[in-house]
Amino acid sequence: MNNQSNCAPIFNRETHWPSPAKLNLFLYITGQRPNGYHELQTLFQFLDYGDTLTITATNTSAITINPAIEGVTTEDNLIYRAADALRQATGTMLGAHIEIDKILPMGGGLGGGSSNAATTLVALNYLWQTQLDLDKLADIGLALGADVPVFVKGFSAFAEGVGEKLLPATPQEKWFLVTKPNVSIATVDIFTHPDLIRNTEKRSLKALLAGVYENDCEKIVRRLHPEVDKAVSWLLEYAPSRLTGTGACVFAEFSSQQEADAILKKLPDWLHGFVAKGVNTSPLMATLHVHSTDCQ
């Protein structure tokens, strides 16, 4: 997809952009590179649920973000880093004010930070009219995080390598009950743990899709975090359930919204969650399409 259009940069107009969650429907770790990065085979699917970024482009050079993340400087914020990376790649010196309505938990395995970075790249490329295509934006995003490219490209995908080799996929669009145990898990803590499985055999996509979906991180996460173990055990009483990413979120899959809502109502006091639908086209792409048609 090409983002080129005939628009001039769009200043001082509030625009709203979705920043959806993702699930890893399966996640296998097949090796580790000399630089420490892990080789993966994973299946990404988006959810129709996530944060919202309200972005106003400006003709000043300032990039401002509200609210700030406690303990994180503006320059270390992934949203700021994405905006600055786009400026570095294109030479533009335009600015933006970005408001974030944050509902995705940090340390949950839903890709919230990566999704925020991707939405920033896609939105500002449109608002600033920097004319990069999605492949180039994905390349910029990869330097910000391994999960950023899938959010930029906007389609559910089978991913290999460190997550950057993406093959479009169309898993069934099921309903999910996503729960968040009361713990935040840093990805680096799981991927550096000596007991993490790192030698799962590589398989063809056909074989993976036909098999039982699992997550190689789940065993060690459940051992290290009893809250996650308790959540998985509770959900398994009702439906197939597993960890997404490195956690801490755990999801159960259902064939209908009614089934998922019924179990949501049964959640114990110690577990919080939400119901969302798996979607194979990111809500971000629909929003970009609507904006882009204004500039044909």
From Swiss-Prot:
InterPro entries: GHMP_kinase_C_dom (IPR013750), GHMP_kinase_C_sf (IPR036554), GHMP_kinase_N_dom (IPR006204), IspE (IPR004424), Ribosomal_Su5_D2-typ_SF (IPR020568), Ribsml_uS5_D2-typ_fold_subgr (IPR014721). The keyword Transmembrane helix does not apply. Keywords: ATP-binding, Isoprene biosynthesis, Kinase, Nucleotide-binding, Transferase. It is an enzyme of class 2 (transferase). SUPFAM superfamilies: GHMP Kinase, C-terminal domain, Ribosomal protein S5 domain 2-like. Its EC number is 2.7.1.148. It catalyses: 4-CDP-2-C-methyl-D-erythritol + ATP = 4-CDP-2-C-methyl-D-erythritol 2-phosphate + ADP + H(+). The active site is at K22, D147. ATP binds at P105, M106, G107, G108, G109, L110, G111, G112, G113, S114, S115. GO terms for biological process: isopentenyl diphosphate biosynthetic process, methylerythritol 4-phosphate pathway; terpenoid biosynthetic process. Belongs to the GHMP kinase family. IspE subfamily. PANTHER family: 4-DIPHOSPHOCYTIDYL-2-C-METHYL-D-ERYTHRITOL KINASE, CHLOROPLASTIC. NCBIfam families: ispE. Catalyzes the phosphorylation of the position 2 hydroxy group of 4-diphosphocytidyl-2C-methyl-D-erythritol. This is 4-diphosphocytidyl-2-C-methyl-D-erythritol kinase. It comes from Photobacterium profundum (strain SS9). The gene is ispE.
